[in-house]
Amino acid sequence: MATKRAWKLQELVAHSSNVNCLALGPMSGRVMVTGGEDKKVNLWAVGKQNCIISLSGHTSPVDSVKFNSSEELVVAGSQSGTMKIYDLEPAKIVRTLTGHRNSIRCMDFHPFGEFVASGSTDTNVKLWDVRRKGCIYTYKGHSDQVNMIKFSPDGKWLVTASEDTTIKLWDLTMGKLFQEFKNHTGGVTGIEFHPNEFLLASGSSDRTVQFWDLETFQLVSSTSPGASAVRSISFHPDGSYLFCSSQDMLHAFGWEPIRCFDTFSVGWGKVADTVIASTQLIGASFNATNVSVYVADLSRMSTTGIAQEPQSQPSKTPSGGAEEVPSKPLTASGRKNFVRERPHTTSSKQRQPDVKSEPERQSPTQDEGVKDDDATDIKDPDSYAKIFSPKTRVDHSPERNAQPFPAPLDVPGAQEPEPFKHPPKPAAAAAVAPVSRAPAPSASDWQPAQANPAPNRVPAATKPVPAQEVAPSRKPDPISTIIPSDRNKPANLDMDAFLPPAHAQQAPRVNAPASRKQSDSERIEGLRKGHDSMCQVLSSRHRNLDVVRAIWTAGDAKTSVESVVNMKDQAILVDILNIMLLKKSLWNLDMCVVVLPRLKELLSSKYENYVHTSCACLKLILKNFTSLFNQNIKCPPSGIDITREERYNKCSKCYSYLIATRGYVEEKQHVSGKLGSSFRELHLLLDQLE
């Protein structure tokens, strides 16, 4: 049976709050770094559910992250304009660079020297010397935020792409603008140098990809507008194709002439980063606190191109101030080739390379005032030791030619397995954690060695649908009792269940005997079944909403919520809570005391939208009041202070309600789907209670 061309590899909860950015390791495609609103930088092994390292140090949310080419360093930029560079082997902050006025949107490491470039929403581009801890040069010229930044393969140029629709090519030696490209009609979201030729590709929110000759600075070709904005572009390592990633789609393009070789339907949403490893393209996207990783099998790609209509674009000629490009070797296409050799530096005497043994190796000087313990939380020591603490510097990171991820079988009509069959495990058990729904072969070098021999497993090719292993002690989750909110067929709801207790048994029930043929009158009664109950439900709900509205419009939100709680109608409570979620200023300690006892009931409801509303309210309360709860529980009032005693009593009530909820949430975090994701995020927030 054939295997899938593209599939979801894994989904995981990456942070305790929203994920803002992510990046895949450019060398191996087997490591991933994420940054979030929680000000943390988390490191992952692709295919595993456990976080390897959690790096802190930022004082504002992290908006951009980037690996260096060897996957030894990670740079993270924050909303406040600060960059921190982490060395992953000692897991330390080695540099803190400040200078941008606003959020840093993109960064890139120089291919040879110890330099980093950054682009910001302040429209400026800065070049940093990592050794000297300072900004070398600030490039000005963009009129909107800088979306993407790249060094050329030879390290002599820097190209920047902005929301102002322009692409600027900077000469690092001369320290000035070398060329500007203005052909896009929307913000430029992706730029990529050809690995060999003097060719630049750019993708934009105008849904096109354009190719530029870096000798003549003319437009080579442009794709036809696609269905959605271009999110990411990357050349194949041999330079034969360009892969364009957009909303749920992956396209393989050629440029002379412009043609589309193949299109993959991937389903990754708004993909954030892609990288090519072995014969596969790995893509990752994020939504709220979750990160999803997808795989496309490039060995299944068609190599027969479909020609596209060339876009009528004006040719771009070099600007008058541009200097002639030095002579370079030519590629098969006739274009000059990038020279990737590190340029020689001037020295007073020749030196033999000094190869240090591992004990002699030292990291760059660490910034003053940065404590190692504050910056690092190694959550998976086994994976960390395997990937980032090898015996030699050469094998510091997973190999580029790592074993490809096995593709699941393409079973007609089979549904994609739900993610999160296994919850995140503690670090002590990380060595035997399953990789994902499609486990990687044990021969893969990037995987940590397992502590115990793996049980005999059926080969992946004989399994009809790949599935994760389930721990023997796991009890089946009663998720089937939940009535989904996005169902596409009747759920056979009992309308009497929505009535208040006083009216619950008033509606007559008509059940025709199944042993004989129904008459017309019985069929009509069957169709009317539940109608009277529904009328009573709607009448009661309308009456109650009128009461709540009258109190609410009088300006007393707390009393109106108390009246809803006393009505014991969960549907009305959910409606009111959804309104309150839109206006966070309504929430205070008094409101928490009133609402929290009912949130546990909603949390155990059989209706999915009730559970989601309860989770959203609990998350809001925990994010805004956890520090207040912990502070008051730690320091109860000692003297006579009525206001403080009232606040302490309210915090104690809220704290006890939340602690009582924690056990139920911990039990439910193992379920799959959206509910499981909500419960896992809620569990992380509840763990912050002391």
Swiss-Prot record:
An example Gene Ontology CC term for this record: spindle pole
Record field: transmembrane: none
GO terms for biological process, alphabetical: cell division; microtubule depolymerization; microtubule severing
Biased composition range(s): Basic and acidic residues: 351-361, 368-383, 517-527
Short name of one Pfam family: WD40
Location relative to the cell: Cytoplasm; Cytoplasm, Cytoskeleton, Microtubule organizing center, Centrosome; Cytoplasm, Cytoskeleton, Spindle pole; Cytoplasm, Cytoskeleton
Start and end residues of each stretch annotated as Disordered: 304-527
GO-annotated molecular function: microtubule binding
Ranges of biased composition (kind: Low complexity): 427-444
Domain of life: Eukaryota
WD repeats: 14-54, 57-96, 99-138, 141-182, 184-222, 225-265
SMART domains: WD40
Classification via InterPro entries: G-protein_beta_WD-40_rep, Katanin_C-terminal, KTNB1, WD40/YVTN_repeat-like_dom_sf, WD40_repeat_CS, WD40_repeat_dom_sf, WD40_rpt
Keywords per UniProt: Cell cycle, Cell division, Cytoplasm, Cytoskeleton, Microtubule, Mitosis, Repeat, WD repeat
Main localization of the protein described in the UniProt heading: cytoplasm
Biased composition annotated in UniProt, kind: Polar residues: 304-318
Subunit note: Interacts with KATNA1. This interaction enhances the microtubule binding and severing activity of KATNA1 and also targets this activity to the centrosome.
Biological role: Participates in a complex which severs microtubules in an ATP-dependent manner. May act to target the enzymatic subunit of this complex to sites of action such as the centrosome. Microtubule severing may promote rapid reorganization of cellular microtubule arrays and the release of microtubules from the centrosome following nucleation.
Family according to the record: Belongs to the WD repeat KATNB1 family.
UniProt protein name: Katanin p80 WD40 repeat-containing subunit B1
